[in-house]
Amino acid sequence: MSLSNKLSITDVDLKGKRVLIRVDFNVPLDENKKITNNQRIVGAIPTIKHALDNGAKAVVLMSHLGRPNGAVNPKYSLKPVVPELERLLGKPVTFARDCVGPEVESIVNDADNGAVILLENLRFHIEEEGSAKDKDGNKTKADKAKVEEFRKGLTALGDIYINDAFGTAHRAHSSMVGVDLPQKAAGFLMKKELDYFAKALESPQRPFLAILGGAKVSDKIQLIDNLLDKVDTLIVCGGMAFTFKKVLNNIPIGTSLFDEAGAKTCPSCREAKAKNVKLVLPVDYITADKFDKDANTGTATDESGIPDGWMGLDCGEKSIELYKEAIADAKTILWNGPAGVFEFDKFANGTKATLDAVVEGCKNGKIVIIGGGDTATVAAKYGVEDKLSHVSTGGGASLELLEGKELPGVVALSSK
């Protein structure tokens, strides 16, 4: 799956066409159905405006919201998105009470002069995800013929398909892979994601550094395996570093996080040497007597080990210097997972110092890519998203891409 040869919205002629766009409007709502964070809607505006500015007959927007489990549930209606979308676009938006069917088709076919239509939640139909769970966790599969019918219903609403929902690209859902139109192109959000991940995974400027943090090694096994073949330097930090320290260096880690399942793969990191990959691990630690923001703190080093009854929740100053050296040497930096428990101020220093170093690097021309999830939360917490080359919007999707997996929503796009 090449990331760099996919058709993009700027490659297609939209004039006079019904443009069907899969967006990600899965936004948080409060109890009064008011949007508490509009970032995802803001992110889709350039793609929608491009279609309107280039003469689209109509722009038809489809999205999911929450997990209604294949049934209509007013709690998850997309209707509350309409006022915010109208405000950001500066024009009226028609809301369709369903996402397929004759009523929706007639709304879409009657639209003209760049009308914008928002369809109701795709996941009100079991055919979108292909299955649903009841409250006891029992799974029901969607009927194959009905899934086909649903996909035909979506296809009937457009002449050109644009996918701008990178965060759902790892899901083979009907709206991601089942729209059967001759031209299927990436929107601006999707294109930016693909361009930056191609820069890292297909043609990185070297030296290429990956910083992998977070808690569990077992969550990152495939990621480590895939990246060991691509990077020049690998920093392993955060909670998962303690499993490496215990297994590879036999260092006492007290009550620090130890991942039994992940421990079995640490020896494979000895392969790093064979692959000429420099492996950087922390060498000193900020410790705590309990997992709590108000815990008593201490310090430990590799020489002393972490005493019984204490756990490492952040790295110390010497480790930060090692990370900074690796960042200074690199030209391409990919960061996935924090360097400590950044949610607690006492243990946020390692993550903050690493962030400061990559922001500085970016200012000096390095390519810095933040791979979604907790690390994107860190960038947002310190308000530096616009000071980095790219902060991914897809936690699960970016992780699967970095693991070397094909993303169904990307595979489904037309090639140039």
UniProtKB/Swiss-Prot annotation:
Cofactor field: Mg(2+)
GO cellular component, as recorded: cytosol; mitochondrion
Amino-acid positions noted as binding ATP in the UniProt annotation, renumbered to this chain: A215, K220, G239, G312, E343, D374, T375
Principal cellular location given in the protein's record: cytoplasm
Compartments, as annotated in UniProt: Cytoplasm; Mitochondrion
SUPFAM superfamilies per the UniProt record, alphabetical: Phosphoglycerate kinase
Sequence positions that bind Mg(2+): A215, D219, D374
Pathway given in the UniProt record: Carbohydrate degradation; glycolysis; pyruvate from D-glyceraldehyde 3-phosphate: step 2/5
Binding residues annotated for (2R)-3-phosphoglycerate, in chain numbering: V23, D24, F25, N26, Q39, R40, S63, H64, G66, R67, L122, R123, H170, R171
GO MF terms, alphabetically ordered: ADP binding; ATP binding; metal ion binding; phosphoglycerate kinase activity
Binding sites annotated in the UniProt record for ADP: G214, G238, F342
Domain of life: Eukaryota
Summary of subunit composition and partner proteins: Monomer.
Protein family (similarity comment): Belongs to the phosphoglycerate kinase family.
Job description of the protein: Catalyzes one of the two ATP producing reactions in the glycolytic pathway via the reversible conversion of 1,3-diphosphoglycerate to 3-phosphoglycerate. Both L- and D- forms of purine and pyrimidine nucleotides can be used as substrates, but the activity is much lower on pyrimidines. Negatively regulates the biosynthesis of acetyl-CoA from pyruvate in the mitochondrion.
Name listed for the protein in its UniProt record: Phosphoglycerate kinase
Organism encoding this protein: Hypocrea jecorina (Trichoderma reesei)
